[in-house]
């Protein structure tokens, strides 16, 4: 009986994805993409660069500020920038064919270079990233990158896991590059990781328009080595309440405030930091969900060039 009980415990400890009730994320199968053709400034060559956004299939021609449409929750690190009057497009997220026309999202850490004689000479490390939210274009500088995007969308459910397919490619070596757009790129010791997270928050706003949050649920994982091809139906468990005393807790799962705070639009229309001030009760109902998938896991403008994360079939599991 004790052996039978142990076997039952082992069998039920990890619930296979097919046993979960899956709610697909809008456009989380990455079958549809918005194609953006942006003509860069003549001082950069005047070429037309193509970048992509996740959403209904259509094409946008010209350097226009992009806003999500068609019910897509997704934003990406692909942006239209205009720095010192120079128009530039950056694309570190692209559609990728898994085979037979089955598209997925490919995120790659790249080095963007902007060089204009006597005016600009910028090198910027850009990890490929997709996330729930919106980026505010055009990007006009590399300062305070989190203030240029809104992280998270309204959401009140309590899923057990984020379910997705993935493939990871990590290049050989043990270094990262720091390139912020100011000064020469620097080589740092230690390799960057690819990362996926889902966080549930309960947010509120005070009379002055400040936004606060408590963490309701947390799922966060990093990938430090290449996978053996595609991993399908992978589950990232979401743990509820204060997890700091749990065996699976890692420092990078902690609260987001100060320099780590993300931003959101308050009721006055202003973009302000979301101050995550504590852990909520394990049975709390969230107001927002944050989902992010990236070829990097470090600070802004730091990464291992060539890190690549492929993802597909994103869903919440219940």
Give the role of each language-model region.
Residues 1-24:
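Bacterial Sec-dependent N-terminal signal peptides
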Residues 170-174:
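Gram-negative outer-membrane beta-barrel proteins
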Residues 176-185:
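Short mixed-charge
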